[in-house]
A protein has these predicted regions:
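Glycine/small-residue-rich loop that forms an oxyanion/phosphate-binding "nest" at active or ligand-binding sites
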Residues: 1-37
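Glycine-rich beta-alpha junction loops
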Residues: 17-19, 51, 77-80, 102-105, ...
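Conserved phosphate/ATP/ADP-binding segment of small-molecule kinases
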Residues: 24-96, 130
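Short pre-catalytic strand/loop immediately N-terminal to key active-site residues, enriched for Gly-Thr
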Residues: 95-109
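Phosphate-handling active-site elements
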Residues: 95-97, 122-136
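Short, small-residue alpha-helix embedded
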Residues: 105-129
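Charged C-terminal helix
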Residues: 130-164
Length: 164
């Protein structure tokens, strides 16, 4: 309801449904509420592939994207079995662009919020959605390349000023 009251507003949603240690952080009721009330009012959704599968189980990636009823969806991937990873930007159910990066080894905490924050900042500065996703991914990649491990925990992105 709050988002409806302050429209127009560009809402970017990072649906944190799974922790970096693969712990489920969601419930069916919460997912349904996000799908019904939040996603249709959002400009961009940034799920990783595992979260997309939780949001729309049993569907292909393109079917899942279409079912979420959000204008733009940036699906991020981190398949550990591959050398290269590919993120995909959709407008409705149409694949608009693929972004390819070399896989960075390790487990990370904070990559999704780094990405969504970077995209938000770029949109505020006037970038269009495709440019904001491109530069936001590049910034996040640099932060992950410089990530530090705290003890035996996951790596944490080092968020420093970065100019693409």
């Amino acid at each position: 309801r709050l988002i409806s009251k302050i429209n127009p507003v560009n809402v970017i949603v990072d649906p944190i449904l799974i922790s970096g240690t693969q712990e489920n952080l969601s419930s069916i009721k919460m997912i349904q509420a996000m799908k019904n009330y939040l996603f249709p009012k959002s400009l961009l959704l940034t799920p990783n592939l595992e979260e997309l599968n939780l949001l729309a189980p049993g569907l292909t990636e393109q079917e899942a994207v279409k079912s979420l009823n959000c204008g733009w969806i940036l699906v991020t991937t981190s398949d550990s079995s591959k050398i290269d990873i590919e993120h995909r930007l959709y407008n409705k159910s149409t694949l608009v662009r693929k972004f390819k990066y070399k896989k960075i080894p390790g487990k990370f905490h904070g990559s999704g919020c780094t990405l969504s924050s970077a995209i938000s900042a770029l949109l505020v500065k006037g970038a269009d959605i495709e440019e904001a996703c491109d530069q936001g991914l590049a910034y996040t990649y640099q932060c992950l390349l410089n990530a530090k491990k705290l003890g035996k925990m996951q790596y944490h992105p080092i968020r420093t000023p970065y100019k693409p």
